[in-house]
Amino acid sequence: MKKVLKGGTVVGGSGSVRADVLIDGEKVAAVGTGEEMERLADEDTQIVDVEGCLLFPGFIDAHTHFDLHVAGTVTADDFATGTRAAVRGGTTTIVDFGTQYEGESLADGLRNWHEKADGKCSCDYGFHMSISDWNPSVSRELDDMMEAGITSFKLYMTYDTQVDDKTIFEILRRLKEV
C-alpha cells in the first residue's frame, strides 16, 4: 500500500526542505512536492497530513550491547526489548557487538549472536565482532568474518574479556592486512 506524508519538513544530511514523502510498502519511494507526488500516487494511496512535523530518515545506533554476558552480569535489554525501544525512538537499524568468548571461534561467536537476534528484532541489525581469545586460528578467520559482513572489530581493554597490549598490536597488524 502506498502512503504520502504530505506537508512536512524533510530533514537530511544537506539541510531541511518542505516536501512530501511517498512510501511504497516499507520503503521510501520518492521525496517531492505537488504534481510530482500526485503523478506517483494512485486512488488507493493514503494521504497523511504531517503539516508542521519534521520527517527524519531512520536513525542508526552503531553501539548496542544486547543480551551480553560480561563481568558477572547481563545487559538489561535483549534483542526483543532493545530493538522495540530503539524503534520507538526513531532508530531503524542497530549494530550490536557480537562477542567471541574464551575457547570460541569468531564464527561460533557470530553464530551465537545471530541466534540471539534472529526473529526477535523489531528493526534492521548488523554486528561488530569482539575479539577476546586471540590465537592463530582466529587470525585466519578474519577474512571469513569480512565476507560475512563484519566490517569492524572491538577489543576490550577492561573486564574479563580484555586483551593485553601485545595482543592488541598483533590483532591490529593482522586487521591491516584484511
Identify the function of each model-found stretch.
Residues 9, 32-35, 51, 70, ...:
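Short, well-ordered turn and helix-capping elements at secondary-structure junctions
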Residues 39-51, 83, 168-178:
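Short amphipathic alpha-helices and their capping/turn segments at secondary-structure boundaries
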Residues 100-111, 116-178:
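Histidine/acidic-residue-rich, glycine-tolerant segments that coordinate divalent metal ions
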